[in-house]
C-alpha cells in the first residue's frame, strides 16, 4: 500500500514513505506533513508525492512546494498543471491509483 495515513503533530509527518519497484527501476516517495495554517499553507498541510525513475526522471508528482508562487501542482513529463486541492487524503488516493495503473500498464508486477 502506498503511504498509510497516521496521526501526527506539526513536527511529525502524517505520511512518510518510500517504495522501490526494483523490476522497473522506479521509486515512490511520499511525504505529507502538518504545518501551521498560514497564507502560504491555508490547509495546514505541506506535501510531495513523487513517482519516478531512480535516475531522477519524474513520471508523476503532486506537490505544493512553492505555495506563495504556484499552489498545488501536478507534474508529468509533459509539463506542470495547477490543480484544485481536494484534501491530502483524496489526493493521495488519486496518486496511488495513477502509480498502480502506470506500473500495471508498463508491465511491472507490483
What are these regions (language model features)?
Residues 79-110:
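Short, compact, well-ordered microdomains
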Amino acid at each position: 500500500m502506498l503511504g498509510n495515513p497516521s496521526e501526527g503533530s506539526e513536527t511529525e509527518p502524517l505520511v512518510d514513505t518510500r517504495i522501490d519497484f526494483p523490476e522497473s527501476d522506479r521509486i515512490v516517495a511520499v511525504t505529507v506533513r502538518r504545518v501551521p495554517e498560514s497564507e502560504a499553507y491555508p490547509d495546514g498541510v505541506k506535501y510531495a508525492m513523487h513517482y519516478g525513475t531512480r535516475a531522477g526522471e519524474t513520471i508523476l508528482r503532486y506537490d505544493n512546494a512553492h505555495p506563495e508562487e504556484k499552489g498545488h501542482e501536478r507534474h508529468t513529463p509533459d509539463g506542470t498543471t495547477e490543480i484544485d486541492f481536494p484534501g491530502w487524503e483524496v489526493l493521495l488516493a488519486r496518486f496511488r491509483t495513477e502509480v498502480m495503473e502506470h506500473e500495471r500498464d508498463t508491465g511491472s508486477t507490483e
